[in-house]
Amino acid sequence: SRIFDKIGARRLAITGMFILTAATLPFAFLTKATPIIYIIVLYAIRMFGISMVMMPVTTSGMNALPMNLLSHGTAVNNTFRQVASSIGTAVLISVLTNVTKDGLPASDLLKTAPLTYRDQATNATLNGYHAAFFVATIFGVLGLAITFFLNKKEAMPVKEVGAMK
């Protein structure tokens, strides 16, 4: 919170989105031979970027609300976060599934050459993951662009509780 107070939500969010996006892109290029430690480190960096985005954006949004609307703002924020997460997951899984399905070998290959089928199916799955992470990177770039529109606003003055109607 001291960093937030010192430099503001905008700079933290921009930095966090940059880290998140930069750490997402390498996932689009993973191979069967990629070491697990590389994936773990990339994932940890992504999570660090997410933490640098979520806290300042949420705090900035709550600071922009008058005190009597904070509970409603929190509820709306939590609802939008859950809905956006669900939609994002559905989109990425759809991309993964469709690209994988389109790249799968013919099923008769499973009977005639099971090892070849396995290799082609693995490559199709990897291509699905590559496509999904590429789409996630595009979402990250869009999110990064949006963070440039954040600005530091002071909290709104407190209104009477009954004035919300």
List the model feature ranges, each with a label.
Residues 1-107, 123-156:
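C-terminal module of multi-pass small-molecule transporters
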